[in-house]
Amino acid sequence: MLVFKGKLKEHPRWEVENELYRFRNRVFSDRLGWDVESHRGLEQDSFDTPDTHWVLIEDEEGLCGCIRLLSCAKDYMLPSIFPTALAGEAPPRSNDVWELTRLAIDAERAPRLGNGISELTCIIFREVYAFAKAQGIRELVAVVSLPVERIFRRLGLPIERLGHRQAVDLGAVRGVGIRFHLDERFARAVGQPLQGAYDEARELVTE
């Protein structure tokens, strides 16, 4: 499998952008039934800009995993779309706090860890951790459904709920706003031995 970390315009294949939006549509619209912006089979929103950062995983069949990273110094989903998930807490407004959104995987296309979690989830967060350390990010936030929160805890990611810590209505599901602590516990969780082979995709080089 190939793992890419960066902006879509840096990806070695230009067609990956539409592949990403189709993959997201299959997961969030078709499979989960979320009320997302979908047009002609592509799921895309206002947070998808040329400067948005991504982690993508591909195999011989195409994309099988993704996550979007947004700086909290700019507009991001938690306060704009899901303010109730802040649970009374003030939204972070700093470039050293980033938001994770649009996490999606096709879990059956990779081996599973001993705890049953797909290796794709582990790989995505390994790359997120590397990105955060390289960018001087001290904290990550996200809005997640309750089942996804349980997956994160099973993986061993150090998370805590925001504000009053109670689940809220997110529309199609109930969920919570969470904070990730980028410490040695996070490093241990994403440093587990893996069965699959995951290689770095080469970035596009321009003159």
From Swiss-Prot:
SUPFAM superfamilies xrefs: Acyl-CoA N-acyltransferases (Nat)
Reaction catalysis annotation: a fatty acyl-[ACP] + S-adenosyl-L-methionine = an N-acyl-L-homoserine lactone + S-methyl-5'-thioadenosine + holo-[ACP] + H(+)
Cross-referenced InterPro entries: Acyl_CoA_acyltransferase, Autoind_synth_CS, Autoind_synthase
Listed GO biological process terms: quorum sensing; signal transduction
UniProt keyword S-adenosyl-L-methionine present: yes
PROSITE patterns in the record: AUTOINDUCER_SYNTH_1, AUTOINDUCER_SYNTH_2
MF terms in GO: N-acyl homoserine lactone synthase activity
Protein family according to the UniProt entry: Belongs to the autoinducer synthase family.
Protein name (Swiss-Prot/TrEMBL): Acyl-homoserine-lactone synthase
Organism lineage string: Bacteria, Pseudomonadati, Pseudomonadota, Gammaproteobacteria, Aeromonadales
